[in-house]
């Protein structure tokens, strides 16, 4: 049971339920192949059945950590920070992003966009989910739209989402990992016939890195 003081700190973004943090090579989307420090925040109620980090869903399993400590750890590694989850926008990201930027770090987010946008982001990767669609602002500010393809019906969803996102967003299709053998050929064919899209692969899993 969290104390009232800790609950207030979490609500303000002075503390966040930190699941894990690690330095690695980005494996997906526009920044594939570049070094980045990942901050994974616990808590998500979007509930994708194919989620590969279901252990992140219950925020209560991840101890509230002072934002200053998270930032101090991040400064030891790359100049690019990726905030992911879970669903990081479940929480107020204002304090975290302010303090990361004060250290002259580039701050990226990977989000479903299902919650109001807080924080200041240098790169906003929107990965929408059918269960809980993005808020309007997420479509407006997204630098990158990454749609996960689990079955052929997801191509329809991808086009629906592409129609909502701003015209400058870069569009990616990425197979759900357990379906990669089945769906990747369809994705390749789709991108060749619809070249506004790009293929995203989970290269970190091929490289066996976090």
Swiss-Prot record:
Q: How is the cofactor bound?
A: Binds 1 [4Fe-4S] cluster. The cluster is coordinated with 3 cysteines and an exchangeable S-adenosyl-L-methionine.
Q: Which domain of life is it from?
A: Bacteria
Q: Does the keyword Nucleus apply?
A: no
One term of GO molecular function: 4 iron, 4 sulfur cluster binding
The pathway is: Purine metabolism; 7-cyano-7-deazaguanine biosynthesis
Q: Which cofactor does it need?
A: [4Fe-4S] cluster; S-adenosyl-L-methionine; Mg(2+)
Domain Radical SAM core, which positions? 31-210
The keyword Metal-binding belongs to this UniProt entry's keyword annotation: yes
Q: Which residues are [4Fe-4S] cluster-binding? A: 44, 48, 51
Q: Which residues bind substrate?
A: 25-27, 40, 84, 210
The record's keywords, sorted A to Z, are: 4Fe-4S, Iron, Iron-sulfur, Lyase, Magnesium, Metal-binding, Queuosine biosynthesis, S-adenosyl-L-methionine
Which parts form a coiled-coil structure per UniProt?
A: none
| Gene3D superfamilies with a match to the protein in the record | Aldolase class I
What GO biological process terms are annotated to this protein in UniProt? queuosine biosynthetic process
User: Which E.C. number(s) belong to this protein?
Assistant: 4.3.99.3
Subunit info? Answer: Homodimer.
HAMAP family attached to this UniProt entry: QueE
- This chain's protein is named 7-carboxy-7-deazaguanine synthase
- The source organism is Flavobacterium psychrophilum (strain ATCC 49511 / DSM 21280 / CIP 103535 / JIP02/86)
